[in-house]
């Protein structure tokens, strides 16, 4: 899917809008600017020193002949930037760097009238000077707002974002809800089918900030037509720190709909969620660690539908863990590794799209484990050449979902037609059949090089060239029951204790074998991109880039279902009217290429992993149709 966009935006006092230029998947920021003397002449040879609790050691740069400097690969955090040159008063600026941002920071130095240097301290806001519309919200901000503590709650605070998609899913700039990109630490966490973020990979107290990009997005980002969301988790530091939190939730604390017929059945029960984080140094300025955990257990009741009403106990236990190591073995070279694991264990689960008439054989315990691994490297090879690379992998599995019996009797599911296909006797789906246990995984490799070019008359250029390889795989054999048989009686009778299916000429059997098992689909996209963030002067800047995406998709039978490619040019211009960041006019044009949809390209014409359907309608004598019995049970 290709989507073009043309935007003209007038922004006043854009205190939260940030310009994103780092490559997709690499959660660092960049500081860049120009240093001049009080009359505006460029100052070469100024030493720029960057310090932060988020940075291992310090970083330095020296302005070139045009007064330009750049400090790349900075982890998100609050920074103190010092500008020093012999014969001039030094200046210090405080600035906030967020993930995937290039923050502009210019400075003017005055000639020192005395031997001692004067220190000028000022505060610099994170103000965009590009045409890319992006908003960053830190946890510090969102904790003060009356909102849910989720990534998506931060996302919907951005302009152009709403939750009007199917099932309340997030849409950005009018695109389909499944065609956004959601990442944590630059790693894709989306479900392969629906495109929604995998919530069990997020520990809310571990999140440092969330950035949402909605328009004018750089060519370094791809596989979307809506927007790009990246959450960055905390990391360790040179001092130990941690947190502990208990969050209490109760349905009754929510307001009900004013219309009685639309009110939900709330349960007056307090459900706690426990979270904890800790981080600190293993070796100061060399090796840091960070760890986080989250635990929630919700005990509740399942409801039996007529003819025998009642309830039965159910529970969902949600456990999440994260660990991160940050290592700087050499100055200007940093390696970060992180691993996140989440698992939801569900007791007495059943296929909730249909009502349940009894628990005998229809409910089961299942697990939904998922994990996320990422390794990131960034390095400064010279004063104007930088490299970054990242590998990541996400795994998600449905474990023990369905019947535990593949024999004819206990493995056959019974769904009663006049009870809304109410379930009885046997469970839908199969946990013990060949190839059971659906897997939805992805793998990503990304590398880029950045060259900083400074010119006297044409400003400065951050030229990025990169390669991005993303593979999404799914293995699914959709067994409909343990025996592949399903019985659809017309109705059901009860003596108050047992259920008896009513079988007449409206009843039928469904045989649903899988003729060809899934080999696993593979949605592969190879991409290359080049992007120039061009700062002409203090008022004019541009973003010029192009991306090429090559799709190669194979369905569950291993047959090719997609083999195409597309270019997506990006062009943006920004005019800072007064040169102070308070009033900007931006215009952008972009072509975005959406990701391959697993639900379409992954199934293919062969239907591997999908069940066939053979219907057999009842033509024998009626069973259990008498008003008083005796009746025959399914046991």
Enumerate the language-model features and the residues they cover.
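Solvent-exposed loop/turn elements at secondary-structure boundaries
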Residues: 556, 561-565, 572-635
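Transmembrane beta-barrel wall of Gram-negative outer-membrane proteins
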Residues: 241, 267-345, 365-388, 569
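Transmembrane beta-barrel strands of outer-membrane/channel proteins
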Residues: 122, 244-250, 291-295, 337-341, ...
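Outer-membrane beta-barrel channels and translocator barrels
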Residues: 148, 234-236, 283-285, 330-332, ...
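Periplasm-facing N-terminal accessory domains of Gram-negative outer-membrane beta-barrel systems
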Residues: 2-3, 10-131, 138, 144, ...
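Residue-level signature of outer-membrane beta-barrel architecture
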Residues: 214, 233, 280-282, 327-329, ...
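Periplasmic N-terminal accessory/gating domains of Gram-negative outer-membrane beta-barrel systems
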Residues: 88-89, 93-108, 116-235, 250-280, ...
């Amino acid at each position: 899917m290709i989507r073009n966009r043309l935007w003209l935006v007038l922004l006043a006092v854009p205190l939260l809008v940030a310009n994103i230029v780092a490559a997709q998947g690499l959660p660092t920021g960049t500081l860049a600017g120009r240093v001049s003397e009080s009359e505006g002449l460029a100052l070469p040879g100024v030493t720029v020193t960057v310090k932060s609790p988020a940075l291992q050691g310090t970083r330095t740069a020296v302005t070139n002949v045009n007064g330009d400097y750049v400090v790349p690969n900075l982890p998100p955090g609050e920074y103190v930037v010092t500008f020093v040159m012999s014969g001039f008063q030094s200046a210090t600026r405080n600035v906030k760097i967020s993930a995937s941002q290039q923050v502009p920071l210019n400075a003017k130095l005055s000639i020192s009238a005395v031997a001692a240097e004067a220190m000028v301290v000022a505060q610099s806001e994170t103000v965009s000077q590009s045409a890319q519309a992006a908003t960053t919200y830190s946890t510090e901000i969102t904790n003060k707002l009356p909102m849910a503590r989720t990534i998506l709650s931060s996302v919907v605070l951005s302009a152009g974002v709403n939750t009007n998609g199917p099932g309340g899913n997030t849409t950005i700039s009018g695109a389909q809800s499944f065609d956004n990109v959601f990442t944590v630490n630059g790693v894709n966490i989306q479900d392969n089918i629906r495109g929604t973020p995998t919530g069990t990979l997020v520990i809310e107290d571990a999140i440092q900030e969330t950035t949402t990009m909605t328009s004018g997005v750089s060519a370094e980002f791809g596989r979307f037509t809506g927007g790009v969301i990246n959450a960055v988790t905390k990391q360790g530091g040179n001092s130990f720190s941690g947190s502990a939190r208990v969050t209490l939730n109760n349905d009754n604390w929510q307001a009900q709909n004013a219309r009685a017929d639309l009110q939900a059945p709330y349960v007056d029960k307090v459900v706690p969620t426990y979270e904890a984080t800790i981080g600190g140094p293993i070796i100061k300025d060399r090796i840091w660690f960070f760890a986080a955990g989250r635990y929630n257990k919700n005990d509740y009741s399942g409801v039996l539908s007529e003819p025998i009403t009642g309830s039965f106990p159910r529970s969902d236990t949600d456990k999440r863990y994260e660990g991160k190591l940050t290592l700087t073995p050499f100055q200007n070279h940093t390696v970060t590794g992180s691993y996140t694991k989440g698992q939801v264990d569900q007791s007495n689960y059943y296929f909730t799209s249909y009502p349940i008439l009894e628990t005998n054989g229809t409910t089961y315990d299942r697990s939904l484990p998922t994990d996320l691994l990422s390794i990131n490297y960034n390095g400064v090879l010279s004063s104007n050449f930088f490299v970054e690379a990242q590998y990541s992998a996400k795994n998600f599995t449905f474990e023990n979902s369905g019947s535990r019996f593949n024999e004819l009797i206990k493995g056959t599911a019974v769904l009663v037609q006049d009870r809304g296909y109410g379930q009885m006797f046997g469970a839908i789906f199969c946990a013990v059949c060949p190839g059971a246990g659906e897997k939805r995984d992805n793998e990503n490799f990304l590398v880029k090089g950045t060259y900083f070019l400074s010119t006297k008359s044409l400003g400065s250029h951050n030229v990025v060239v990169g390669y991005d390889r993303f593979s999404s795989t799914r293995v699914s054999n959709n067994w409909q029951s343990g025996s592949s048989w399903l019985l659809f009686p017309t109705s059901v009778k009860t003596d108050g204790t047992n259920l008896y299916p009513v079988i007449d000429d409206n009843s039928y059997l469904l045989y649903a074998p899988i003729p060809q098992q899934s080999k696993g689909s593979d949605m592969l996209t190879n991409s290359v991109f080049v992007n120039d963030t061009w700062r002409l002067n203090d008022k004019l800047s541009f973003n010029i880039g192009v991306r090429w995406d090559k799709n190669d998709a194979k369905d569950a039978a291993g047959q090719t279902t997609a083999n195409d490619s597309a270019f997506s040019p990006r062009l943006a211009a920004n005019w800072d009217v007064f040169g102070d960041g308070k009033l900007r006019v931006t215009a952008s044009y972009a072509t975005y290429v959406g990701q391959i949809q697993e639900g379409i390209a992954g199934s293919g014409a062969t239907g591997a992993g999908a069940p066939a359907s053979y219907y057999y309608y009842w033509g024998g004598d009626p069973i259990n149709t008498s008003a008083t019995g005796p009746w025959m049970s399914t046991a």
